[in-house]
């Protein structure tokens, strides 16, 4: 019975407030990768949205979930660490550098 309780505790989805904090971490990480809120890459809304979408898809693929609020509690710490280290793809990084360098030229 204790095994069942432990299993349920670890497999239970995270609290909605924790899911919200993960979304905030994602936003902060993506904005930082884009070069900040004043960067041309962030100002290009269509491009910025695609980077946010890429980040979301990467996260959901990594944890094999369809929605943030379905993340099992046992992965809560790993999810936080994920957003601290997430990086866009190489092609996306090159586009960010191109957009941000263009404004400095």
Would you name each region that the model predicts?
Residues 1-105:
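A general nucleic-acid interaction/assembly signal
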